[in-house]
Amino acid sequence: MGELSMQEMPLPALFEQGSKIHASAESSVDQDTVRKGCEILRQCEEMIGKLGLFSVNETKEDISTANLKYILVPYYLAELTEKVADNDRIKVLKASQAKLKEFISFCETMELVPEEEIETSTQGGANSSVDRRAKKIARFKRQRAAESKLLEIKERKERRGRSTKAAALSSPVETEEDDVLDDDGEEEREAWLTTISLGLCKAFDLLEMLKKEEEILSAVKEKQLQDGEREFSQAILDERTKKVETWHRDAAARAHHTKPAAPITCATFAQDVIEGRAKVSQAHEHKHQPLIFGPASLVGRNPTTEREKIAAQVFQPHYRLPTMSIEEAGLTEMNMMNEWQERNVKLMEEANSSWYKDTPKSRPGEDDEEDDDDAAQDKARAWDDWKDDNPRGAGNKKLTPCG
């Protein structure tokens, strides 16, 4: 069998392949491999968005252990994007910084960023060299602690695996696996949370480094433009403007004839896609847009800013939201009724068919039973006739004195 294409691969397989490319890119930089890894991780991001695995209303405790690893996708994509060789280095740096900021912002929403990092970001960064040095030392300590913890979890898992294998070989009795599975689940969650913490430490350092590199390159480019070594001609600008206008016209023309696909509303469909039992089409898009029951619904307008969206989500229903509309429920019941009527019509046709109207043939033993009944009736009639001819006591009349 041939290999599955990137669109047909399930999300766990895509993430595993992308993480392997990310790990191998740390030692050797092959541009084809790096670009392939970026493409795979972008496909992961697109599938995560369509499946709606994460919500801004959740924290790290609300995310399942199986989905924790997908938080690292923007971080892996940022590191691979930074390694892409391109003539426009500033464009690569901006793309990598955007993914790093997206990763840090989402981790902050999930309450995964340390308090000291949040305080530093709210204050606009450390001003003095002493503050910057203290921040780097604290970050380095967290990074070393996370690396040591990951190594400890790995060694503990290997030891437990060896002991379990030895116990299975020495004892023929099957051991209980519930405790082992619980330990594995707790260790897996702890390992992914530690990996995310390690990724945050590296992401902050990489973001600072990329900002400095962008500042240097921007200064060099500005100096080159001022010196006249490299200028954009008016023809190039006109050509780019023409391309943009053409693209917008084509997009507007497609929008009139393109019907957007219905969003994925079934909660189990996302899990089916994750485990590879179903495929998600390119047209589907699933976003967390819950029904609004808060202030925005009272004033009769849709929320536009993030503040209005959060305020609109204050008053939420205490009951479970419906999974289908009234029209869909009516169609389902109508289909059930049609099937029931078709089944009844079929049964009535079978009941009125000639096979049921024909008189059933007598069985082989019924003729013998009828003959036995006639013989018994003849015998009973003969006995009655004899009793009429010979009344009771008629044979003893000669023995009586008056006889």
Curated annotation (Swiss-Prot):
One of its GO terms (cellular component) is cytosol. Residues 158-184, 351-403 are annotated as: Disordered. PANTHER family: IMMUNOGLOBULIN-BINDING PROTEIN 1, PP2A REGULATORY SUBUNIT TAP46. GO terms for biological process: regulation of dephosphorylation; regulation of signal transduction. Belongs to the IGBP1/TAP42 family. Pfam families: TAP42. Disulfide bonds: none annotated. InterPro entries: TAP42/TAP46-like_sf, TAP46-like. One of its GO terms (molecular function) is protein phosphatase 2A binding. Residues 376-391 have a biased composition (Basic and acidic residues). Disruption phenotype: RNAi plants show severe growth retardation, the formation of spontaneous disease-like nectrotic lesions leading to premature cell death. The defective plants also display a strong reduction in protein synthesis, and chromatin bridge formation at anaphase. This is PP2A regulatory subunit TAP46. Involved in the regulation of the TOR signaling pathway. Seems to act as a regulator of PP2A catalytic activity. Residues 174-184, 366-375 have a biased composition (Acidic residues).
